[in-house]
Structures are given as C-alpha cells and as structure tokens.
C-alpha cells in the first residue's frame, strides 16, 4: 500500500468511526491539506455536509447545531490560521458546556518550525478551553487500526458527556492528498480495516450514567426547603429540556416562586409569571427576602437577581448542576451539588406544603404589569425595541424555535416577553462568554439542528459583526426570520455611566454605523421589510413565518428614545409593585 492509499483508507475509517457514534453532520471549510477528510465525509453515504468559506462562521454554526441537537457536528479545516478562526466559538462552547469536535488537518512533523508555508503549531492551540485534545499520527500502517478507532470514539464521548465541551483532534497528512482506492490484498492492516467496515458496528460504545444525587444530599436539601420561611427557586441556563421541565414541575409542586431565566428555556412558558419584572423592584425585594435559595443550572441574564441576592444574603444558597466547575460569581453559594438536575428536582417533590407568598398581591402585580406591557403593543403605535421583543413572544409559532443575541436583545426578551406557550418554545442564546460575535451563524446552526423555522432577535452591531453568515441562509432547508433592532450603534452603552462622557461616547462606545440593510438583504437574496408600527411589524412577521425564504425585518429606533422608553416603563412597573408590597 502506498502513502496515498493509506491516507485515503485512514480518512475513510476516521469518518466512518464518527458515523457509527451517531455523528452524521459535518461542517467543512475548503482547503488542500484537509482534502482526505473532506473526501471521506463527502463520499460517506450516511454523512451530511455543509460547506463554509469562513471557519469562524463554521464553528459558530456547529455550536448552534449542538445547542439544538446535543450532538457534535465535526468541523473539518485545513492547516494554518484556518483552525485559529474556530477560537471564538470554542470559547463559547467550552464556557457553556456545548459539545464540539474539531478535526484540523496539519503539516507532518518534518514541516514544523522550519519555515514551511501555512504551518503553525496547531496541537493544543485551544489550550484550557478543550475537554480533550490529541495529536494524531500521520496515517501509517504501523499504527494499529484499533488505536485510531478508539481514539475517535473516545473523542466523541469526551465532547458529549459531562462536562460537555470541545475536543480537538489534530491530524497531520503528507502529500499527496487525492484519493486512491486500494485493491484487495493480503496486508494485515488492510484486512482488519475491511473486517471492521463490514461489521457495521462501533469499535467502542461508551455509556455514562447520570449523576443521581445520594440520599444524604437530598435529605439536606429537603430539610432546608421544609424549614425555610421563604424559599426561592432559580432556573438558570440549562442544556436539557427535561431538566427545565423538572424544575418547573418542582416549583408547581412546592408552590415556591420560580425565577425562570430566558436561558433556562422556561421564560415564555405559560403559567410561569416573569419574576424578572418584580426583581427590579426595591419594594418587592425588601418584602420578599428569601432565606433559602435553590438554584438549578448556570448563570442568568439580568443583574437584578445578583443585586437581590446580595441584599437578601440568604442563609442557604444551594446550586444544583452536573458540571464539576465552580459556579459562584459572587462567592455566596453555601452548598453545591453536582448531580442530575431532573433527578434532584424529582426527589424534592412534597418537601413542603405551604401557600405561595402573598399570592394575591403577586397576581395583582402580574395582571397590571401585563396591561402596561400590552399598552406597548397597541396596533397603531410605533414599533419599538421592547414591543418587537414582546410581539415576537406573542406571535412565534409553536412549531418554531427562537434564538436571541446578546446585549440588549436578550435583556428585552428576558424582561418583557409574554408567557403564553403551554409547551414552551425551543430557545437559545450564546451566554457562555456572552459575546456578540457569530450570532447569525449560531442561529443558522440552531435552525438546522432543530429543522424548524427559527426567529432571531439581534442588534445592528452583532448583525454587522457576522454579516458574511447571511450567505449560509440560501442553502438552509428552514428559513430564519431575522428581526434586526437597528438603533445605529451599541444601544446598551446608553444604559451605562459612560454615556455621560459626551466627548467620547458617540465615537468610541456607541460606534454608529451607516450601512444599508436593504442592500445587504438584496446581496444575499433575502426578503426585507421595514415596519414602522406594531401592526406593520406583526404583518411582516407573519409573512416571513409563512415564507420558505429567510427574511430580514429591520426595526429602526433611536438610542435616546429607547433609553427613555425603558426607564419610563420600568418606573411604571416599579410603581405598581411599590403600591402592592410597601409595608
């Protein structure tokens, strides 16, 4: 067997090993050094592939796909800076425990650090942001076939299982790269390869059991819940819908208020009142004052909760999550349980039986708050950033998914969304590192993974940051409805103290852009709408939902007016709470 034949068969086996682990969607960026891997994926009848000119976009797409499916979509790229472009998405995936598998082609040993073209040190390039990385050998019949198979299968297991995250396989190849089939022969390596290919079975199957809480931990949590004067449940970021549903069921069983963050997937679920609206009220925080807080999952979007926890200083602040990483941003967690969220929540049912705290006042508040918010979506009123978020939450279909960008978009959805969907809506954000990069790409991957028409709420700076990702949408099998909140700059900075620095603010922080969104839509073959009223927005949104083609709905706003709108609305909501909860 010559080198070309060995490389072809090696790459075929590598891809087939992935397929037999349930991995069947590959994100490929064109390149010469990665030719053997690309051809192996393209020729495998069970592999699905998508091509990306930009590796950064590819990695964020794979991240979105993982958020939807809890499965890796292997990234294949050539050598050099191609692999480095994965880094932003690698950080996000690692920080938010999302599975990702990178297979980067590389130069062989003899071309490293000798001035060879397009050659960098790729092994361990992602540092501490990987769960595992491995430098694979250059394809050779001297390497036992079983070692290649078990390495690939272990890579998938490390990416998927707790703590899920990024795995990097760095695969060097020697030229030539073009495929060459191998005729039947007596070579032991070739024969073992054929036997494995014919077997149709995985070489290794990994089973990882859920971390179920032990009796002592459950007894402790139940005791704190039973004796609490006023408990509070928090649903932070979660990967699994079953976990989120279990936490919601626990809150209902125990009649304990539940703070359901947008990242939990519960925020728009019916029968879960948005505690976000109360959390910003000093009157409510002073009156409520929980002594026991049970926090499931990870972080939350709004700062109001952290402010409240600092004020309350609960005697017991307990966190339940599977990942073995520290989670205590304010260093106030008193007990941490590494266990299945769903199993823990189920085990805590019937811990207490007391009526909801000041249920009548809370019901009155949420009824009046809903009236205030509905006043913002009156048909003939101008469309605003707040009303756009609320109208999406009201009109998104049960068969759709929702992705929301960081910065103001997720804050508005977390705060002002309507809670109307009995079964909930598949939702996601990139909240691991909370960047605004790669949002369009991630949303496209999220839509692809779900196989559902997906709405994206995004600001103009995040939109421009990932503009080239619009090129992906034409080949998606499901459309995106991109609701673009365009306040001509970084609107969130208007809410920060730096806004008072008149000499610097506009140039260095607001950073206004003056690009034509309609021309961008035309360039990439997308539909475009620019509604000016709430009724026009609803009509444009409904039309986009019914279209097989992706649409950009541009909502133009003023940063100054948006800031004032938020302040006035929040002041009215706080006034309602003050009347009900003062004294």
From Swiss-Prot:
Enzymatic reactions: isochorismate + 2-oxoglutarate + H(+) = 5-enolpyruvoyl-6-hydroxy-2-succinyl-cyclohex-3-ene-1-carboxylate + CO2
Free-text cofactor note: Binds 1 thiamine pyrophosphate per subunit.
Enzyme class: transferase
GO process annotations (BP): menaquinone biosynthetic process
SUPFAM superfamilies: DHS-like NAD/FAD-binding domain, Thiamin diphosphate-binding fold (THDP-binding)
Pfam families the UniProt entry points to: TPP_enzyme_C, TPP_enzyme_M_2, TPP_enzyme_N
Top-level taxon of the source organism: Bacteria
Pathway: Quinol/quinone metabolism; 1,4-dihydroxy-2-naphthoate biosynthesis; 1,4-dihydroxy-2-naphthoate from chorismate: step 2/7; Quinol/quinone metabolism; menaquinone biosynthesis
Cofactor(s) essential for the protein: Mg(2+); Mn(2+); thiamine diphosphate
GO terms of molecular function: 2-succinyl-5-enolpyruvyl-6-hydroxy-3-cyclohexene-1-carboxylic-acid synthase activity; magnesium ion binding; manganese ion binding; thiamine pyrophosphate binding
InterPro entries to which the protein is assigned, alphabetical: DHS-like_NAD/FAD-binding_dom, MenaQ_synth_MenD, MenD_middle, THDP-binding, Thiamin_PyroP_enz_TPP-bd_dom, TPP_enzyme_TPP-bd
EC number: 2.2.1.9
Keyword Transferase: yes
Record's keyword terms, sorted: Magnesium, Manganese, Menaquinone biosynthesis, Metal-binding, Thiamine pyrophosphate, Transferase
Subunit structure: Homodimer.
Family from the record: Belongs to the TPP enzyme family. MenD subfamily.
UniProt cross-references to NCBIfam families, sorted A to Z: menD
Function in brief: Catalyzes the thiamine diphosphate-dependent decarboxylation of 2-oxoglutarate and the subsequent addition of the resulting succinic semialdehyde-thiamine pyrophosphate anion to isochorismate to yield 2-succinyl-5-enolpyruvyl-6-hydroxy-3-cyclohexene-1-carboxylate (SEPHCHC).
UniProt-listed PANTHER family: 2-SUCCINYL-5-ENOLPYRUVYL-6-HYDROXY-3-CYCLOHEXENE-1-CARBOXYLATE SYNTHASE, PROTEIN PHYLLO, CHLOROPLASTIC
Name of protein: 2-succinyl-5-enolpyruvyl-6-hydroxy-3-cyclohexene-1-carboxylate synthase
UniProt source species: Chlorobium chlorochromatii (strain CaD3)
Source organism phylogeny: Bacteria, Pseudomonadati, Chlorobiota, Chlorobiia, Chlorobiales
